[in-house]
Every structure is written in C-alpha cells, then in structure tokens.
C-alpha cells in the first residue's frame, strides 16, 4: 500500500480531471443536440412558410382580380374549384393595406385548422378559419374568424395594424366573399383583451343581448368610429388572433369587430 501522501493527491487530481473531461464531453454533446434540433426547427418553419406561400399562390389563381381599381372590388372567387380542393372552404377574406388575402375554412372543431393548411396538410401556420359552431353562411349575430399572429406577417400577422387609429382611417373596411354573396365589412371596434373576456361571445338569446354586446365592444375599442349598426337586421364578424405586443400577457388577443354590408 502506497503511504506517500502525494500519491493520493495526484490520484484525486487525476480523478477530478477525468470527471471534468466527461462533463465537458456531455455538455458538448448536449450543445450539439440543441443546435441540431434548433436547425431542424428553423428548417421546418422555413419549409412550412414556403409551403403556405405556394398554396396561397395556387389558390389566388382561382381569384379573378379586376385590372382597374374601384370603390367596390369585384373579385371573382371560383368557389366551385376551391371546394374541389377542400370542401371546408366557406369564404375568402381580403384586407387591403395588409397581406391578408386568404380563403376561410370551417372544420368540425376549432383545433384542426390551427395547424393544418387549406389542403388539410400539417402546417404550424394553420389557416384562417371560422368557429365550428357558426353557420357557414355568416348569418349568425356574430361569427368569429381565427388566425395565427405570425412573426413574418402571414395569416393574421398584420391585424396589429388596426390598433393604430391612423391605419384604421386609411382602411376602415375589408371584404368578405362567400359562395352565396359578397360583403364589405365596416370595422367599428378594435382592441386587445384576454381569452376569458366577455367579448368572446357569439351566442345571444335576444336582440337586447346582442345590442348590449355591441355597446360593450364599442366601449372597449382603442378609438371611436361613426359606424351605425342596426341590431334588428345587421350581422357582425370578429377577427380574433393572439397578441404578441410588448408588455402584453400571453392570454391577450386582438379583437377586430366589423358589421357586414351586402354588396350589390
């Protein structure tokens, strides 16, 4: 047995060095795994962005855009062909001043189109879709339309612009096209609220309840508008998306309310 005290010190140092070497190797391995996964996710997101853009370009070929602009855009949407691609298509939304120019789909739940594109293939960007409980002809008092708030501005990534009154003044209306008729949508309220907000309501038992709701969301708006609403006959739609603005809570959402006006 070696009784030299330096022997034990040296042996302990060797042991410590081996442990440190193993820790460094493990940390390097962990770093490479994280880096590899990050690169994989970045590549996946880029592929999904490209796929989503390609699908959008293919679908836009089914929309006839007039060569000369007018106060009432006369887009012609070939819903017959769109429904051959996906029978869940119920409309098309166009918001000028943004890149929002998409078909609207409706599934049998509110989960599927959160991460599936218009061709029903997996895509984390999802689709623009109507609440599954709503009538597919937008005849309910209030139809909710959902879409992701994306960093690259696709889907509902540009709804945030309506938080600014100056943008609203330049883009007070947007357009909704359906198989049975086309509409302008006059925005009368825009704000950020939480997922458990009383604004998240699309079912009313009476005209009085609907009128109370209209007054409620008008009060919440970032700015006032002069839009008139006849609760006895008018229907509204609500654009709904996540809010990623600074100092906002993760449960905050954009609410954009608009009243539908039938185009002649």
Model-identified regions with their sequence ranges:
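Solvent-exposed, non-transmembrane regions of membrane-associated and secreted proteins
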Residues: 35-264
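Gram-positive cell-envelope targeting signals
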Residues: 1-63
């Amino acid at each position: 047995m070696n009784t030299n005290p330096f022997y034990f010190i040296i042996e302990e140092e060797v042991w410590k060095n081996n442990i440190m070497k193993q820790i460094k190797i493990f940390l390097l391995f962990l770093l490479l795994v994280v880096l590899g996964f990050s690169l994989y996710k970045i590549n996946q997101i880029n592929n999904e962005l490209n796929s989503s853009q390609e699908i959008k370009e293919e679908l836009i070929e089914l929309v006839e855009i007039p060569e000369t602009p007018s106060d009432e855009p006369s887009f012609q949407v070939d819903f017959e062909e769109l429904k051959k691609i996906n029978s869940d298509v119920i409309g098309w939304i166009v918001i000028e001043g943004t890149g929002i120019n998409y078909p609207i789909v409706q599934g049998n739940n509110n989960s599927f189109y959160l991460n599936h594109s218009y061709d029903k293939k997996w895509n984390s960007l999802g689709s623009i879709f109507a609440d599954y409980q709503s009538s597919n002809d937008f005849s309910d008092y209030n139809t909710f339309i959902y879409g992701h708030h994306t960093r690259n501005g696709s889907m509902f990534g540009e709804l945030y612009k309506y938080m600014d009154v100056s943008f609203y003044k330049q883009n007070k209306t947007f357009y909704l096209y359906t198989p049975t008729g086309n509409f302008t949508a006059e925005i009368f309220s825009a704000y950020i609220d939480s997922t458990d907000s009383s604004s998240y309501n699309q079912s009313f038992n009476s005209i009085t309840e609907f009128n109370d709701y209209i007054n409620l969301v008008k009060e919440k708006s970032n700015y006032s508008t002069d839009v008139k609403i006849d609760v006895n006959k008018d229907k509204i739609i609500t654009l709904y998306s996540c809010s990623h603005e600074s100092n906002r809570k993760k449960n905050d959402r954009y609410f954009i309310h608009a009243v539908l006006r039938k185009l002649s």
